[in-house]
Design a protein with these regions (language model features):
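Radical SAM [4Fe-4S] cluster-binding motif and immediate context
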Residues: 48-220, 225-227
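Glycine-rich beta-alpha loop elements in corrinoid/cobalamin-binding modules
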Residues: 1-41
Length: 228
């Protein structure tokens, strides 16, 4: 489930293990409580209160999930969950293979808000798979282009490369300021991919990676070394 509706109660009672055992939606090494409902309308959530977080400390140290092009950046979560069944990953169980999305307008509104508030020019998308819906990612790119929002943005958490459908999508990503995409092929072994239950189209993946190179979008591939 999602933490928003129980976060305050959890933080207030962090030191009280007996109390935490009664809050649904929590899992620890000692207990696994019942699930809680997901937030169905992600657009209904407020933008993150980054003003209450020591962003300057992270900027000074250069800490980030993806490589930095600017001194200042902010993380964005434009969707939650993942529809794929990979058996090495906790997400299919915790999110029931559901991919929930924010509207492109809501995401771009958040970007605009933090550009104005913090003079930030770089955004790191932390979604597990922000490119699952091709029409949605294109709409998001087009909104950034139409609004003339001058930013760099990166997909940093390892999106499924085949969910990037075409060279047209790559071109829009580039025009909107995307200059880095982390992808997750996991392995070059088709036998291992079957074992981890991850469908993968190698031919399409290679085509998209070549398209990234052509559009000068830096790519990083994540691999699993050793699978029990």
């Amino acid at each position: 489930g999602d933490l928003e509706n129980i976060a305050l109660e959890v933080f207030i009672n962090l030191g009280n293990l007996n109390y935490l055992k009664n809050i649904n939606g929590l899992i620890t090494k000692n207990f696994c409580n019942d699930k809680i409902n997901f937030v169905e309308n992600l657009d209904s959530l407020s933008f993150p209160a980054w003003e209450d977080f020591p962003l300057e400390n992270y900027w000074k140290l250069g800490y980030s999930h993806g490589p930095l092009s600017e001194k200042k950046y902010i993380s964005v979560l434009s969707s939650r969950g993942c529809p794929y069944p990979c058996n090495f990953c906790v997400v299919p169980k915790t999110n029931e293979r559901r991919w929930r999305l924010r509207s492109p307008k809501n995401v771009v509104d958040e970007i605009e808000y933090f550009v104005k508030k913090f003079d930030v020019k770089e955004f790191h998308f932390e979604d597990l798979n922000p490119t699952v819906n091709d029409s949605r990612i294109k709409e998001l790119c087009n909104l950034i282009i139409e609004k003339k929002i001058n930013i760099k943005w990166k997909i940093v958490a390892g999106t499924k490369v085949e969910s990037i459908k075409s060279e047209e999508t790559l071109s829009l990503l580039k025009k909107s300021g995307c200059n880095y995409i982390s992808i997750s092929p996991e392995s070059g072994s088709k036998e291992l991919m079957k074992k981890i239950n991850k469908p993968f189209n190698y031919d399409h993946a290679l085509k998209i990676v070549k398209g990234m190179n052509y559009n000068k979008i830096f790519s990083q591939a994540c691999f699993i070394i050793g699978y029990p």
